[in-house]
């Protein structure tokens, strides 16, 4: 009944107006699944490869017709007739068909689109929501949202070197209330930025992108907005950073071009420690560059027992790199992006490895998103307790928050909001 009878891919647009892959999977019983693949701006060197056409006459070379052809021809031929419920086998077949260590032949965007659409079709056939199909009866934890309210780095055209300044409403009683808290802080931040003479244009992920001189200035505005909304910084709402340090790591040093400052790895670790001591920061992502393992070790030893240190470019949702980090005692959390590794099975394996090692896991979007809300379901399915999906603006971001609100409503009395316990270093 769940045999795959059709797989069809198409080229659609993401939130930046760039093409991406969308896949439909149809089963023998008429069940259907659809998934759209996100795309990153600051990408780790060790990520699975997003296959682009390179034809400058279409979308400036960013077209995905090759990936679509791979889905409609090679992948469909390999999967036709297989049972959609056998997710592990299906993903394994696609990975073997690709045959490269980074999915560069078929494209991670091709493989992932099919992988997620297959899971959705199987869930449809089972008459279950995706979070329940993937996570089973234990899937009931609603994640703390890491809401990106100020953008910098490659996500914005401003002098701020850090990529994201986030709020984490850990004290809220529910995801619906957490979204309300975040929205109220977001709107008050907009007002305070305007009063201070800053523009309130938004970046790729919906956060404001003001011309602020430093990370400290951005953090000050965040704290003021939290207080103006009637919440207590460091109690009701914490702060989070995504430094995206790989983007400004040059010749062994961290070059803050916006501030005109250069820091050695040791100075970078000390700077992050200083920030975390001065502000109610609960989480720092990619505070060191992806291959600066010594720097990561230093910052972990310095503040890893106090706050969450998230590896994004460091781990790229890859169990091999995560295993190495665990063995070396580096970071204490992994950012989970389905398109970094390129299949649902491998994504779930990364979350499982992290949780078994006592690391936290944060389900995450990409800066180039679509209206697809799969990651909201996956956050609940894995009970990971945290989700990073942008600001309180742009429908490509709010689609995920809205889906979480629906899931919470559907779970009813079974629903549990993760709260402060999601951040083990602080709980």
From Swiss-Prot:
SMART domains cross-referenced by the UniProt entry: Enolase_C, Enolase_N
Cofactor binding note from Swiss-Prot or TrEMBL: Binds a second Mg(2+) ion via substrate during catalysis.
Cofactor requirements of the protein: Mg(2+)
E.C. numbers: 4.2.1.11
Pfam families xrefs: Enolase_C, Enolase_N
Annotated keywords: Cytoplasm, Glycolysis, Lyase, Magnesium, Metal-binding, Secreted
Annotated GO CC locations: cell surface; extracellular region; phosphopyruvate hydratase complex
UniProt subcellular location: Cytoplasm; Secreted; Cell surface
Domain of life: Bacteria
GO molecular function: magnesium ion binding; phosphopyruvate hydratase activity
Paired cysteines (S-S): none
Pathway(s) where this gene product acts: Carbohydrate degradation; glycolysis; pyruvate from D-glyceraldehyde 3-phosphate: step 4/5
Reactions performed catalytically: (2R)-2-phosphoglycerate = phosphoenolpyruvate + H2O
The keyword Coiled coil appears for this protein: no
Catalytic residues in the record: 205, 337
Positions annotated to bind (2R)-2-phosphoglycerate: 163, 337, 366-367, 388
Gene Ontology BP term (one): glycolytic process
Residues holding Mg(2+): 242, 285, 312
Protein family according to the UniProt entry: Belongs to the enolase family.
Described function: Catalyzes the reversible conversion of 2-phosphoglycerate (2-PG) into phosphoenolpyruvate (PEP). It is essential for the degradation of carbohydrates via glycolysis.
Protein name: Enolase
Organism from which the protein derives: Methylocella silvestris (strain DSM 15510 / CIP 108128 / LMG 27833 / NCIMB 13906 / BL2)
Phylogenetic classification of the source organism: Bacteria, Pseudomonadati, Pseudomonadota, Alphaproteobacteria, Hyphomicrobiales
């Amino acid at each position: 009944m769940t045999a795959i009878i059709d797989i069809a891919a198409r080229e659609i647009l993401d939130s930046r107006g760039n093409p991406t892959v969308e896949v439909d999977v149809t089963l023998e019983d008429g069940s259907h699944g659809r998934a759209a693949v996100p795309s990153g701006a600051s990408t780790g060197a060790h990520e699975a490869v997003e296959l682009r056409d390179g034809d400058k006459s279409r979308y400036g070379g960013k077209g995905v017709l090759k990936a679509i052809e791979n889905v409609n021809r090679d992948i469909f031929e390999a999967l036709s007739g297989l049972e959609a419920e056998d997710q592990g086998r299906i993903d394994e077949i696609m990975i073997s068909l690709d045959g490269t260590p980074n999915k560069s032949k078929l494209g991670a965007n091709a493989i992932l689109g099919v992988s997620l659409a297959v899971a959705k079709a199987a869930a449809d056939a089972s008459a279950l929501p995706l979070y329940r199909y993937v996570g089973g009866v234990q899937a009931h934890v609603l994640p703390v949202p890491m809401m990106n309210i100020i953008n910098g780095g490659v996500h914005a055209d401003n002098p701020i070197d850090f990529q994201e300044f986030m709020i984490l409403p850990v004290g809220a009683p529910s995801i619906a209330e957490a979204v309300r808290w975040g929205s109220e802080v977001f709107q008050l931040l907009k007002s305070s930025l305007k009063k201070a003479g800053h523009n309130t244009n938004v970046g790729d992920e919906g956060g404001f992108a003001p011309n602020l001189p430093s990370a400290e200035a951005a953090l000050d505005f965040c704290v003021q907005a939290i207080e103006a909304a009637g919440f207590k910084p460091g109690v009701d709402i914490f702060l989070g950073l995504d430094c995206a340090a790989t983007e400004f790591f040059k010749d062994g040093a961290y070059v803050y071009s916006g501030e005109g400052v250069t820091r050695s790895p040791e100075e970078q670790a000390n700077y992050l420690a200083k920030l975390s001591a001065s502000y109610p920061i609960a989480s720092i992502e990619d505070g060191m560059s992806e291959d600066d393992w010594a720097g990561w070790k230093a910052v972990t030893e310095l503040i890893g027992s106090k706050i969450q240190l998230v590896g994004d470019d460091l781990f790229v949702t890859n169990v091999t790199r995560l295993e190495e980090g665990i063995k070396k005692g580096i970071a204490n959390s992994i950012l989970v992006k389905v398109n970094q590794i390129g299949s649902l099975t491998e994504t779930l394996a990364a979350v499982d490895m992290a949780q078994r090692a006592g690391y936290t896991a944060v389900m995450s979007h990409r800066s180039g998103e679509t209206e697809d809300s799969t990651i909201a379901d996956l956050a609940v399915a894995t009970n990971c307790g945290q989700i990073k999906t942008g600001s309180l603006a742009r429908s490509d971001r709010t689609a995920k928050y809205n889906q979480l609100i629906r899931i919470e409503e559907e779970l009813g009395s079974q629903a549990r909001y993760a709260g402060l316990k999601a951040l083990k270093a602080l709980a």
